[in-house]
Amino acid sequence: MSKKKDRLYGRLVYALSLAYNQAAFGKGKERHANNKPFEEQTMMVANRVTDGGFGWGQIFKKIQEIPNIKDPDMKKAEMVSIIVYAAGWVLWFEEFMKKGEARGNLDNITGVVGSKGLPRMEE
């Protein structure tokens, strides 16, 4: 990474590295890894089974919970976990697209495949 890019995106790299460290060495490894690669861990399997709904649900849940967390370190850890779940969601979506399963129904109110019964947001 060039010095200019470091100056422009260094803080983003820092935030992403927090997510990597949490998943690879911290809470993620302790609770979820079971010595499996990231793409084979429970989160990724759950995303596949729920057409991405698991990742969306975890992100939504954490967004709801974070304002009630008083401890700053715990609050930050939960924020970082959103990045991990979002990364898993991106990887699930790439798999989904490669399989040719995209049918144009990812634009509903939740952004999750399979929630066709929910009302659409008005533009």
Give the predicted meaning of each segment.
Residues 1-123:
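Intrinsically disordered, low-complexity regulatory regions
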